[in-house]
């Protein structure tokens, strides 16, 4: 459980878990800045991240990065992603589920949620604002992907929803 504010820079990792059935609870604000910097990283199947705190990602960093099948991310806080190669939530694996309930702002070439795998679902119920060339709200690369957009989506400036 991460309760306080965390700042991760210069290629560092805030929380890293290797193994199946891992859960990370982030209740405090997480700031990730810089290439190869990661807020929370899980390597294993059935990984789960509960992001109740705010997530601020820039400079090519990754907020949440899970490698493994059947991963789940519940994002309830405010997510801000700025700059090319910056990704708020990335999952590499099949049967991933991402629930974005908080407000998300994606700008300057950043990506809010990226899932690389088959049978993935992204449930977007919070407000999402995407602004700027090459900025992307939600991207699924794989077969049988499903994006459910129940929240407001505002796309401008050459961005992609």
Regions found by a protein language model. Name each.
Residues 1-11, 21-23, 28-36, 49-60, ...:
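Beta-strand-rich solenoid/repeat architectures in extracellular/passenger domains
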Residues 19, 44-46, 59, 68, ...:
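Extracellular, beta-strand-rich repeat scaffolds characterized by small/acidic residue-biased motifs
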């Amino acid at each position: 459980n991460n309760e306080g504010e965390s700042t991760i820079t210069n290629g560092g990792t805030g929380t890293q878990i290797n193994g199946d059935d891992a859960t990370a609870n982030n209740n405090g604000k997480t700031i990730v800045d810089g290439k190869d910097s990661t807020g929370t990283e899980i390597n294993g199947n059935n990984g789960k991240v509960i992001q109740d705190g705010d997530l601020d990602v820039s400079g090519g960093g990754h907020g949440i990065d899970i490698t493994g099948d059947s991963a789940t991310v519940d994002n309830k806080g405010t997510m801000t992603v700025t700059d090319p190669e910056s990704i708020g939530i990335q999952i590499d694996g099949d049967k991933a589920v991402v629930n974005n309930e908080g407000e998300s702002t994606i700008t300057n070439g950043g990506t809010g949620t990226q899932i690389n795998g088959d049978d993935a679902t992204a449930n977007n119920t919070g407000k999402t604002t995407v602004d700027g060339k090459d900025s992307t709200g939600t991207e699924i690369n794989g077969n049988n992907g499903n994006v459910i957009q129940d929240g407001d989506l505002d796309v401008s400036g050459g961005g992609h929803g």
